Amino acid sequence: DTHETFVTTNLRVIMEMFPDELEQLVNIHGVSWDPRFERRITVHFTTDRGVSAEANRHRANSPMESSTRYCNFSKGKFENQITICVPEEINDQQLKDHETSSVDISENIILPHDTSDWCDIDWWIWGNSCTELAYMKLLECGWTPQRARRILPLDLKTELIHTATVSDWKHFFDLRVLGTTGAPHPDMYEVAKPLYDEFQRRGYL
C-alpha cells in the first residue's frame, strides 16, 4: 500500500530554527521548492487596549501584548493606579483645561453633585475614574487581578509588539492607514500613520 504523510507547521519558524533539518527533508523526498526570505520588522507600540484589539486582528503577524491577567495595578510598580491613554479626539489643551474640573475622584464618585455643566471630557474622566475605583475595590474584596480586569476600560494603556514581513505590514497599512476596505478606526490611524510614514522614509514600501 502507498501511504502519504502530510506535515502542517509554521514554515517561517522551521526555516529560522531548523534549516538543516528542513533541507534534509526536502532532499529525502525529492521536493522541488524555491524558498523566499523576506525582511521581517518588529515594531513596539504604546497604545490602548481598544487599538490593540484592532491591531491583533492581523493574525499573520507575530504579536505580543502586556498582560492584565497577572498585573496588579494596586501595587507600587504601577503607582497604585491604572494608566489611561487619551483618545485622539481630545487634544492636550482640552485635557489641561479639565485638570481641575468638577470631576470628584473619590469614594463619593457616584454623581456627588450637579453635573448639568459637565461636558464629554468630564464624563470621560469620570467614567475611567469609576472603573479604576471599582477595580481597586474588587481587589480589596479578594478578587484576583484576572477576575477584576473584566471591568478595565478599553482606554487602558498597553504595550504591544508586532513582528511581520514587509508584505504583511503593507496589508496592515492598507487597512489601518489607507482604508482600502473602509475608513480606519481613528485611534488606530493615529498610531499607524506615523509608522507608515517611517516605513516610506526607510524605503520599505
Predicted regions mapped to residue ranges:
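Family-specific signature for flavin-dependent thymidylate synthase
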Residues: D1-L205
